């Protein structure tokens, strides 16, 4: 065990660090999963609370997060390059189904991902239109926007961004790329281009919110199948947990928040706890021969 490496300082400030970890009710010898390693803030703190017999499995689909995780030199720790929806397969591989004392998820995009312009998550910084959390697979936002129809894009913007001007924005994006094909000009390929196009398409501006906020969120959620990933994990999480195991989730936007609250509410109501049997005290007496 190397506690110095386990709880090293980081420029990234972990959101709700103590609140989320406290929700796990850590046992010093427990087995835990950090399903969204990110830059390791939660994982390092969990490790600092575990004994030499504790264990932490971290999961992330971002290659940069995996690189950060490899900096942790601790025999109690291991990293899995995968999305958290694959936690059941990871548990099965490690023979840990039904043995996990706690699972932690910090949903959505991380601040380091937003800060890195080349990742394409932020409309505040110019970068390539990528938006993939795992840059090794799947379509980038640029590639998807080249082929999407107005109808499908409108649905995505409404469903995942709750954008009231979805049709206007979708039409502007698809028409721009169609024009590029016709005129031999460049497709939408930069975050700044997309943000400006959305701003022009939106008839009314919110003083407190950038016009592209909801659209960027919607496209990112779709590209990364974020809500599908969450639903898949929620459907299997309880089977992974040991008796008295904990599930601690940080959610930010209303869509994932509703999913988590609905899950928690239903499971609390529907959970069937084993019946407790009470028996009379057995009296013993000493028999002398």
Curated annotation (Swiss-Prot):
Binding site for S-adenosyl-L-methionine: 40-42, 60, 84, 106, 113
Primary localization class, coarse: cytoplasm
Pfam families: Methyltransf_5
One MF annotation (Gene Ontology) recorded for this entry: rRNA (cytosine-N4-)-methyltransferase activity
Enzyme class: transferase
Intracellular or extracellular location(s): Cytoplasm
GO cellular component, as recorded: cytoplasm
Catalytic activity as recorded in UniProt: cytidine(1402) in 16S rRNA + S-adenosyl-L-methionine = N(4)-methylcytidine(1402) in 16S rRNA + S-adenosyl-L-homocysteine + H(+)
EC number: 2.1.1.199
GO biological process, any: rRNA base methylation
Keywords: Cytoplasm, Methyltransferase, rRNA processing, S-adenosyl-L-methionine, Transferase
Function of the molecule: Specifically methylates the N4 position of cytidine in position 1402 (C1402) of 16S rRNA.
Protein family (similarity comment): Belongs to the methyltransferase superfamily. RsmH family.
Name of the protein described by the UniProt record: Ribosomal RNA small subunit methyltransferase H
Protein's organism: Haemophilus influenzae (strain PittGG)
Gene: rsmH
């Amino acid at each position: 065990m190397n506690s110095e490496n386990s709880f090293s300082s980081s420029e990234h400030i972990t959101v709700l660090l103590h609140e989320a970890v406290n929700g796990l009710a850590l046992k010093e010898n427990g087995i835990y999963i950090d399903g969204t390693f990110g830059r390791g803030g939660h994982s390092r703190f969990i490790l600092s609370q575990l004994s030499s017999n504790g264990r932490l499995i971290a999961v992330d689909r971002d290659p940069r997060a995996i690189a950060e995780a490899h900096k942790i030199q601790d025999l109690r720790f291991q990293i899995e390059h995968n999305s958290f929806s694959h936690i059941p397969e990871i548990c099965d591989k490690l023979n840990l189904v039904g043995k996990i004392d706690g699972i932690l998820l910090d949903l959505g995009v991380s601040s380091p991902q937003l800060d890195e312009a080349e990742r394409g998550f932020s409309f505040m910084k110019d970068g390539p239109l990528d938006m993939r959390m795992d840059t090794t697979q799947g379509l980038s936002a640029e590639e998807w926007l080249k082929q999407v129809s107005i109808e499908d894009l409108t649905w995505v913007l409404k469903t995942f961004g709750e954008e009231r001007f979805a049709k206007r924005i979708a039409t502007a994006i698809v028409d721009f790329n169609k024009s590029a094909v016709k005129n031999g000009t460049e497709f939408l390929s930069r975050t700044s281009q997309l943000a400006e196009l959305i701003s022009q398409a939106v008839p009314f501006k919110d003083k407190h919110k950038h016009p592209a906020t909801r659209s960027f969120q919607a496209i990112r959620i779709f590209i990364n199948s974020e809500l599908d990933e969450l639903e898949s994990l929620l459907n299997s999480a309880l089977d992974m947990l040991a008796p008295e195991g904990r599930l601690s989730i940080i959610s930010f936007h209303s869509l994932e928040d509703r999913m988590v609250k609905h899950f928690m509410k239903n499971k609390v109501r529907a959970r069937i706890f084993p019946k407790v049997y009470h028996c009379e005290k057995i009296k013993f007496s000493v028999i002398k021969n």
